[in-house]
């Protein structure tokens, strides 16, 4: 995983060139938006339990068979595993947002996730639905449209951060589909 600075330096070094022009402008933008990024990560962290439990509850409401005998969320152990997986996925989304780089998702979260879920008999469509609910919830928190919030409102336009988070969620959904 490379942060924005390491990525720029690595690219410039590979070209045997100085860092300048558009690379410096991109870093300036990254720095100026840094407080928004930190606030967004803080909102995810502060509301993670609610975001994940709402996503899993929503997934189950749409597919009640998941909590019937034989369903993938039936028994406390399986429900706990489902909630744990949701927390892990959301945690890696927050890491990617903090770094401004999605490679942490590929390297540490998505690599082999689909195969593991298939081997365990986890319905991938339910996973995709839970991720889409998390995407909507996180987007609402970041863009200040969530009805219940913990903390202050992020100042300024955060649509770029909301779009970035949406792209991470879409990447996760595509990886497990």
Swiss-Prot record:
Source domain of life: Eukaryota
Subcellular location: Plastid, Chloroplast thylakoid membrane
Function comment: Light-harvesting photosynthetic tetrapyrrole chromophore-protein from the phycobiliprotein complex.
Binding annotation for (2R,3E)-phycoerythrobilin 1: 72, 77-78, 82, 84-85
Disulfide-bonded cysteines: none
UniProt cross-references to InterPro entries, sorted A to Z: Globin-like_sf, Phycobilisome_asu/bsu, Phycobilisome_asu/bsu_sf
Membrane topology of this protein: Peripheral membrane protein
GO BP: photosynthesis
Assembly mode: Heterododecamer of 6 alpha and 6 beta chains. The basic functional unit of phycobiliproteins is a ring-shaped hexamer formed from two back-to-back trimers contacting via the alpha chain subunits. The trimers are composed of alpha/beta subunit heterodimers arranged around a three-fold axis of symmetry. The phycoerythrins also contain a gamma subunit which is located in the center of the hexamer.
This protein's name: R-phycoerythrin beta chain
Binding site for (2R,3E)-phycoerythrobilin 2: 35, 39, 154, 158
Binding-site residues for phycourobilin, renumbered to this chain: 50, 54, 61, 147-148
Gene3D superfamilies per UniProt: Phycocyanins (1.10.490.20)
Residues annotated with N4-methylasparagine modification: 72
Family: Belongs to the phycobiliprotein family.
Family matches, as CDD domains: PE_beta-like
SUPFAM superfamilies: Globin-like
Modification comment: Contains two covalently linked phycoerythrobilin chromophores and one covalently linked phycourobilin chromophore.
Coiled coil region boundaries: none
Miscellaneous comment in the UniProt entry for this protein: The light-harvesting antenna system in red algae and cyanobacteria is formed of phycobilisomes. These are composed of the phycobiliproteins phycoerythrin (CPE), phycocyanin (CPC) and allophycocyanin (APC). Cyanobacteria also contain phycoerythrocyanin (PCC). The phycobiliproteins all share the same subunit composition and organization with variations in the covalently bound open-chain tetrapyrrole chromophores.
Record keywords, A-Z: Antenna complex, Bile pigment, Chloroplast, Chromophore, Electron transport, Membrane, Methylation, Photosynthesis, Phycobilisome, Plastid, Thylakoid, Transport
Native organism taxonomy: Eukaryota, Rhodophyta, Florideophyceae, Rhodymeniophycidae, Gracilariales
Organism, as annotated: Agarophyton chilense (Red seaweed)
GO cellular component, one term: phycobilisome
